[in-house]
Amino acid sequence: MTTQPHNRRRFLQLAGLGTVASLAGTPAAAAQNENTQKNRRQRFELGLASYTLRKFDLDKTLAMTNRVGLKYIAFKDFHLPLDSTPEQIKEVVQKVKDAGLELYGGGVIYMRNERQVNNAFDYAKAAGMKVIIGVPNHDFLPMVNKKVQQYDIKVAIHNHGPTDKVYPTPASAIEKIKDLDPRIGLCIDIGHTQRAAVDPSIPAEKFADRLLDVHIKDVSASSAKGSTVEIGRGVIDIPKFLRTLVKINYAGIVSFEHEKDAGDPLAGLAESVGYVRGVLATI
């Protein structure tokens, strides 16, 4: 496999850490390192978009999430159906808690009519979710705006790339929601953003005040033909993106959505989590 230029640059940067480490014993270096850590502290947490484990039942999904050391999860309706009763939702939420995880959100949830909008918010409220990762049709954004104000639940609009007619890019979503309640913002899917030939670091910084959630992944090409690969093996400049999140003081969840190998995703997911943690340890 050909090494991507940004990965090669990152390798050289990481290699340079040996020099930094050799100086860490001096008082000046220690003070400088302490100041750097204070100025560039990571405020976000890592989580999982359960679409990654769409071929697995709830119990296996919770167990596999724990195996890769993630503590926050957002459920796709495979794991908590949208038509669940309040009693069923309560039972599932308790299972999540018993597994030592936090169910922070749900999605992607489509809202194409009034019934679906009402159901999405009732579902999220019953589950104690803080955010709906959603795709509301443009005509229903005024209704979503009222629901956000009524329920105090955030809606993070998810972009789906160059073939999506509703929200192909983060910028296309902002154009529709810029005058709405700020609790309606973005879930930037960095893979679909890159597939639209947009560097995901750019909208993350430009729309920082409306960034509510992140789906992190890597893709094989900056075009509609790009598909999910293990993080670090694709074309996205992951170190740059993570540095951007630190720079803008992003304080939400960065959820892994590893779409590759649906029947056997654990190895690729673990590799991706390890790569991201390794990068974060250096910034």
Q: For each of these PLM feature ranges, what is it?
A:
Residues 16, 20-21, 38, 59-62, ...:
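Active-site acidic/histidine proton-transfer and metal-coordination neighborhood
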Residues 74-91:
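Glycine-rich, proline-tolerant flexible connector loops at the mouths of alpha/beta enzymes
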Residues 2-45, 55-68, 125, 170-188, ...:
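Histidine-acidic metal/acid-base catalytic patches
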Residues 78, 111, 137, 216-219, ...:
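Flexible loop residues that form catalytic
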Residues 52, 161, 260:
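Residue-level signal for short, function-critical loop segments
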Residues 44-49, 73-75, 103-108, 132-134, ...:
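Hydrophobic faces of well-ordered beta-strands that scaffold small-molecule active sites
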Residues 82, 141, 223:
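Short glycine-rich, flexible loops that bind phosphorylated cofactors or substrates
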